[in-house]
Amino acid sequence: VVSAILRGLDAGALRTMCDRFRDARPNMVVILISAQEDKANIAVSVGKEAQAKGLNAGKIVREVAQVAGGKGGGKPDFAMAGTKDVTKLDDALEAADGIVGNMLAD
């Protein structure tokens, strides 16, 4: 799992970064959060090998976004969410590893 909070990137830039990581490492889960003033975007990308292990970007992004008071969804390989509570981004990122770990354990 690669995860980071970035500043000032729009949703398109987040998607591009996630796609590049996913294409380079099919066993990887990438969770990127970009804060912009009073809102944030959360992007999750899951490579093919990671999907084969039961991981789903749509499910991951929903759970991560809930920690930050946001909502989102998407496909098994890529999903996005948004939140207006930028004060909880660190909590969301910290929860991400546990969320992925729980999905692998199921």
Predicted regions and their residues:
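Glycine-rich, acidic loop segments that terminate in or are immediately followed by a histidine
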Residues: 2-106
